[in-house]
Amino acid sequence: MDTKYKDDLFRKYVQFHEGKVDTTPGNQQPGSDEYLRVAAATLLSLHKVDPLYRFRLIQFYEVVESSLRSLSSSSLSALHCAFSMLETMAINLFLFPWKKEFRSIKTYTGPFVYYVKSTLLEKDIRAILRFMGYEPELGTVYKLKELVESLQVKMVSFELFLAKVECEQMLGIHSQVKDKGYSELDVVAERKGSTEDARGCSDALRRRAESREHLTTSMARVALQKSASERAAKDYYKPRVTKPSRSVDAYDSYWESRKPPSKASLSLRKEPLAMDVGEDLKDEIIRPSPSLLAMSSSPHGSPDDLSSISSINGLGLLRSTYFSTQDDVDLYTDSEPRATYRRQDALRPDVWLVKNDTHPIYHKRSPPTKESALSKCQNCGLSCSSSLCQRCDSVLVCPSASKPSAFPSKASVHDSLAHGAPMREKYVGHQTQGLDRLAPVHSKPKPSTTATSRCGFCNRAGATNTCTQCSKVSCDACLGAYHYDPCCRKSELHKFLPNSQLNYKSAPFSQLVYR
């Protein structure tokens, strides 16, 4: 700060107030100190001047900051009034030092309490009054010392005048930037650390506010773009499965949890029921039960037979549609799906039947009647009308009429083949009782059909060999052709044995056949 300019302003300030006291007619002084205020504002706004040199005796910015932080009633306008009142005390002291009323200051009076004590801290008030020569006495009164330094009192009064003008400038800056969210304390901090004038401080605060708003807007835009991209990514990777897919293994539990249809509801159907449970498993087929084999041996199986098979199956699920046993289809070469099979083909009056699988000899016969239907022995292949084979005395397996439960036919077949003759007779007795029990329900007697197995390679009837590892069945013709086909269960070759040499001590779920 220019010292010469400040000293010149100090002399004009002292002359202005001393001229008020001089009542001589030739000494005329202006009645307003407006020119002093303008000169003081220019002094405080000099460019590139350190803020520490604006005030010499009073630490103005520290006093204002502590008051604004500590006292809720303090503000820049209140500080302006407080500095103006202290300036008046200093002016009266250096103009009228002999008057007794100015030799003491009572701090409990109304103006002092309202304008000074409610705005400035007690320590700052004590420091300013000590610069003027007052010392505290009895806690509520300040007494003037015997010796009063008139020059120091004038300098303190001039500092208080500059403090009053600086408060006016900071109020002007705050009025320009308060719409940007700045407080009076922010203005004081900016003015304390800036070497610019009042206009430069207000422009700096505005630029800082605009940059902060721009940064906030940019951050909000980035956050919105990020949230939008996250939502788009979630929508892109969101699984769009509205219902369980029938071709995915993960939803097998969905189909297993469904309740099997009751036997009564299936018996009311007039057409053969074919329930599609999804795509067939690639390397697994279900070994048909004896009752299903008995039904499939006749091309004219009734819907009642199919309903009884569905009830025996337990789950009520069939793997394919119903077709005749004489429909020789190779599972490895046939390109036409089995679903295209028409039931009208099976209901034709003239049906060509195969008599021998090894050397095919076809003969034409009329549809069999219920009286002429015979059962074929699984061991020797002889057709018999009774429940016992006339050649090898083996029990002929008939469809079971028991209740629908999970895999009931498996236990009955294995029990009848694993135990001796007493168990076989007992099994036949139970089957007879079951058929007698079903007689009132179905008015028509059921035909006795042959129970033969289909080959797991060519799907032809007459499978007489079974693999001891994976339970896959094969006919004599495919046994030589596919003997070296690897067994998928243990990655070894198949070990086929004739059915007559099997002891039927199989593991659970022996109806599963793996290809």
Swiss-Prot record:
Pfam families (alphabetical): SPATA2_PUB-like (PF21388)
Subcellular localization(s) per the UniProt record: Cytoplasm; Nucleus
Gene Ontology terms describing biological process: necroptotic process; protein K63-linked deubiquitination; protein linear deubiquitination; regulation of inflammatory response; regulation of necroptotic process; regulation of tumor necrosis factor-mediated signaling pathway; seminiferous tubule development; spermatogenesis
Boundaries of every PUB domain copy: 78-150
Keyword terms of this UniProt record: Cytoplasm, Necrosis, Nucleus
Disrupted-gene phenotype: Mice are fertile and healthy with no obvious abnormalities in major organs in normal conditions. Males however display a decreased fertility: they show reduced testis size and sperm number. The proliferation of germ cells in the seminiferous tubules is decreased in male gonads. Impaired necroptosis: deficient cells show resistance to RIPK1-dependent apoptosis and necroptosis and are partially protected against RIPK1-independent apoptosis.
Residue positions of motif PIM motif: 321-338
Its job: Bridging factor that mediates the recruitment of CYLD to the LUBAC complex, thereby regulating TNF-alpha-induced necroptosis. Acts as a direct binding intermediate that bridges RNF31/HOIP, the catalytic subunit of the LUBAC complex, and the deubiquitinase (CYLD), thereby recruiting CYLD to the TNF-R1 signaling complex (TNF-RSC). Required to activate the 'Met-1'- (linear) and 'Lys-63'-linked deubiquitinase activities of CYLD. Controls the kinase activity of RIPK1 and TNF-alpha-induced necroptosis by promoting 'Met-1'-linked deubiquitination of RIPK1 by CYLD.
Name of the featured protein: Spermatogenesis-associated protein 2
Organism expressing this protein natively: Mus musculus
Lineage: Eukaryota, Metazoa, Chordata, Craniata, Vertebrata
Protein encoded by which gene: Spata2
